[in-house]
Amino acid sequence: MEFLHTNNGVLYCGKNPIILRGMGLGGWLLPEGYMWKFYTKCDRPRRMEKLLRELCGERYAEAFWERYYDRYITERDIAWIAGQGLNSVRLAMNARHLFDIGEQDTVRFHTAYLRHVDDCLAWCKKYGIYLFLDMHGAPGGQTGQNIDDSESDIPELFTDRRNQDILVEMWRLLAIRYGNEPAIGGYDLLNEPIPNWNRRYNPQLLPLYRRLTRAIRDVDARHMIILEGAHWATDFSVFDDYTPEEAADNIVLEFHKYWSDPDEESLAPFVETAKRLNVPLWMGEGGENNLQWYTYAFPMYERLGIGWCFWAYKKMEVPNSPATFEKPEGWDQITAYLDGGERPAPEAAQAIFDRFLNCISHGEYHPEIIRALTRRPPLEIPAGAYDAEDIQSGRRAGSVFRRTSKATLLFADGHTGEADWRRYGGEAQPEDQRILLRLSEGDLVGDRLENPENQKIRIHVRSYGDGILDVQDLTAGQGLVWVSCSSGIINVENLHITIEE
C-alpha cells in the first residue's frame, strides 16, 4: 500500500487518483446507546458502562467490555467490507479509553484498548484497505453530546485549555506510533466539533487545528490530516481564515451529511471552500436513511470527485446498515428498566448481556445497502437521481430540489415545495414524497450504473403518461444507462434493474 496524498485538489494513491469508499466503524470502540436501541437515557459509553456495573456488578462489567471489543468488529467484518469493493474504514476512537492520563497530565497509551486499533490496522493491511483514525471522543468532549462521550453535555475541550494540551500530546503519540504505516489513510483530528448552540467556541477551532497539525508534522510529514467543519461537520465558515498555503500540507476537508437534499446545490458551501483552498473533500459520515436517499447521494459524491464513508456499518436490528444483529431475548427488560421499570436481578441481567454478546457475534449482512451506495445491480434507481442530462423542455414548478438542473421534478400527488428526506429508520419515502421526473420530447438523462462483472442486465422503467421512452444501456463503455423521450410527455418514477439469469 502507498501513502495517500493530495495534489491540486485531488486525492492520490501513489500516482493514481482515488475516490474513497468506506465504512464508519461506529459503535465499536466508542459505543453509542442508539445503536443498542437505548436512545437518550443511556446514550454514551460512560452511561452504558454505569448501567452494566449497576445491573451486573463490577467484575462482570469489566469482563463484558473485554468480550465486547473482541467481538463487535472482527477480521471477518474487514474482509467483508473489502470484498464489497470498498477501500477504507473510519475508526471512531474514545480518548478516555485509548489513553491513560497520569500525574502532571502525562499521556500514555492504554495497551488493552490500543490492541484493538492495532488489530484493525493489521486486518486492513491484510485486505488492502485504508484505516482512518477518527478522534470521536476527545478529552473533555469536542461536541458536548452523546457522540463524544461527554460527561456534562458541554464541549469541555474548549472550556479547559488543559484538555487541548492533552489532545495535542495524544495526536503526537498516535503520529509517532503510526507515522510509518501507509495503511493508515489519515488522521481525522476531531469528529463534529462544536454544535451551533455553542458557537461562541468556534473561534478556538482553527487555532486548535493549527496547533494539532504542527504537533503531528513535527513527527510525521507524510500522513493526511483531515479537518471537519463545526456544527456536525456542516459549518465551513470556521475555515474562512485558513489559507491555501496552510492547506497545501496534505490537508483534506471533511463534511457530514444526513437527512437533507441529496443534491449538488446542498454541497455548494463545502465545494466552494475546497476550491478556494485547493484541497479534496471527504464526506466522512452520512447514512441512516433509506435506499432511495443512498442511491441519490453517494453516486453524486463520486460524480463530484468526493470520497465517502458510510455511517454506521453495524447496528442492532435496522434495515439501513450493511451489518446488523438481532435484539437478544430479554432486552426489553433492560430498556424497560431505563424507562423506570423493574430492575432485573443480577443473574438475569448477566444472562441477557451474555445473549447480547452472542448476537453481535452472529450478525447478518445487507448487500442491498452496498448496491445502493455503489449503483450495482440489482437495484432501483429513482428517476430524479440522474447523473447526466440534456433537457430541451423548460423546468416547471414541482419539487424544490436539484434547483440548477433544467429537468422538471414533480411530486406524484401534485403539490409543490421542498422534499422531506428524514427517514431515520430506513423506511421508504411516503406517498406524498414520491418524486417523478417529467420528460418531454427530446429530453435525455443518464444514470450511472456500475457493472464490474459485465453481467447481462434487464432494465424496467416505471413511468406514467402517453409519451414514448427509449432506453439505451451504455454501461460497458460510458457507465451510463440513457433514458430519453422520443415523443409526447411522460413522468418517470424509477429504473428497476435486475440481472438476467
Q: Model segments located where?
A:
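An active-site-proximal structural segment forming one wall of the substrate-binding cleft
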Residues: 4, 60-89, 97-99, 103-141, ...
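Short, solvent-exposed turn/loop segments enriched in Gly/Ser/Thr/Pro and often Arg
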Residues: 92-95, 135-143, 190-193, 229-231, ...
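Charged, glycine/proline-rich intrinsically disordered loops and linkers
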Residues: 40-62, 328-347, 409-414, 421
